[in-house]
């Protein structure tokens, strides 16, 4: 059995753990900023293709305490790297250190690299390694003097689904958008709306969830090139995911006041294969209105990080709050914002609040209705 580490944004650990449990993996444990689980090498493909809220998939090869560089070196050298890295492999090292004696990340990277090379030298009988072949990204973390080290199976982060327009930076990563939709308990039955849709990330993730479409079907992963991981594992995982897809009629809507953003959102929906069930329109959130008895509203309005922008954001929240109060009582609403005065401006205290991080920005999810 392999131990997998799924890093995630702080606050999303339970959602990621629930996703992994639904995939049937064993010994699922949520910790701060990551979830650990046990599975086979075939599960590496299943995790990468299916996870909506996790940041990446790391196959852990070693966990040990280290308070000195010598302990770090010996711990890394004890791992059977030759079972995973062919002689021509490229094996760069990335990682971080928090609350540990070994606080210098560059020094840790250097020691880890040296230890792996020494292990491979002994096995392959080579003095130098060209690193011209397939990439096997080594990832490590040192947290409170405990080292976790393994191979990054994902490559680019799992938020890169493959549908976002090149060169367009969204304020909300796809993994966090999927988490917000999941928190709203949307399952595809009721109307779903995002009146500040921007490039369409939240409505597109809602459509993928409604269709039960795996988010990783349209991209590549680093581990697909690993010599020890059979290609059939990826084909089987993709087939399994496609067999679970739903085909129905969905009422998913996104609006934005910026026509260019709406054009990008429509293009992204087409690339994601959900343009048949998501409508995007140029619309003013201050005029938002719906008559249906039930529905979900999930949105990420502008925060306004600078003073003038904050004042504009507050005016926007007031206007949106006034429109929102016309919604029928059966609607569930989730608003992600870092603005400390959101509830006052919106005009109603949240029924529930949940702390999340949007990248490095500390935010609250303000929840209204039966959430």
Where are each of the predicted segments found?
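A short, flexible beta-alpha/helix-coil linker loop
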Residues: 98-101, 157, 302-306
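C-terminal edge-of-domain segments
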Residues: 138-154, 366
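C-terminal catalytic and target-recognition region of SAM-dependent MTase-like enzymes
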Residues: 284-287, 291-371
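Conserved S-adenosyl-L-methionine
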Residues: 172-290, 305-306, 310-314
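Short beta-strand/turn micro-motifs composed of small residues
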Residues: 8, 256, 337
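SAM-dependent Rossmann-like transferase core, predominantly class I methyltransferases
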Residues: 149-185
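Non-catalytic nucleic-acid substrate-recognition regions in nucleic-acid-modifying enzymes
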Residues: 1-134
């Amino acid at each position: 059995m392999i131990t997998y580490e799924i890093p995630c944004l702080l606050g999303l650990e339970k959602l990621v753990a629930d996703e992994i449990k639904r995939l049937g993996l064993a010994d699922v444990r949520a910790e701060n900023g990551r979830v650990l689980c046990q599975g086979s090498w075939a599960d590496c493909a299943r995790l990468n293709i299916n996870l909506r809220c996790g940041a990446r998939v790391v196959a852990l090869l070693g966990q040990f305490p280290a308070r000195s560089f010598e302990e770090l070196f010996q711990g890394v050298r004890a791992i059977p790297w030759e079972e995973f890295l062919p002689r021509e492999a490229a094996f760069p090292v990335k990682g971080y250190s928090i609350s540990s004696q070994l606080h210098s990340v560059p020094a840790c990277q250097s020691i880890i690299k040296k230890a792996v090379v020494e292990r491979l030298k002994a096995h392959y009988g080579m003095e130098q390694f060209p690193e011209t072949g397939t990439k096997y990204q080594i990832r490590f973390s040192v947290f409170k003097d405990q080292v976790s080290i393994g191979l990054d199976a994902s490559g680019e982060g799992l938020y890169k689904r493959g549908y976002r327009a090149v060169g367009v930076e969204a304020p909300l990563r796809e993994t966090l958008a999927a988490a917000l939709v999941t928190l709203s308990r949307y399952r595809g039955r009721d109307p779903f709306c995002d009146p500040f849709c921007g490039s369409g990330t939240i409505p597109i993730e809602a459509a993928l969830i409604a269709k039960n479409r795996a988010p990783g079907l349209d991209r590549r992963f680093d581990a697909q090139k690993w010599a020890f991981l059979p290609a059939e594992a990826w084909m089987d995982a993709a087939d399994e995911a496609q067999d679970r897809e739903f085909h129905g009629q969905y009422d998913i809507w996104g609006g934005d006041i910026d026509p260019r953003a709406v054009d990008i959102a429509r293009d992204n929906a087409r690339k994601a294969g959900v343009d048949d069930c998501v409508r995007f329109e140029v619309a003013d959130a201050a005029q938002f209105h719906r008559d249906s008895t039930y529905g979900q509203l999930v949105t990420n309005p502008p925060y306004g990080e600078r003073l003038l922008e904050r004042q504009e954001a507050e005016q926007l929240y007031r206007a949106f709050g006034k429109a929102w109060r016309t919604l029928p009582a059966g609607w569930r609403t989730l608003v992600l914002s870092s603005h400390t005065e959101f509830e006052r401006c919106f005009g109603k205290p949240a029924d529930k609040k949940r702390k999340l991080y949007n990248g490095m920005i500390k935010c609250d999810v303000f929840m209204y209705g039966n959430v």
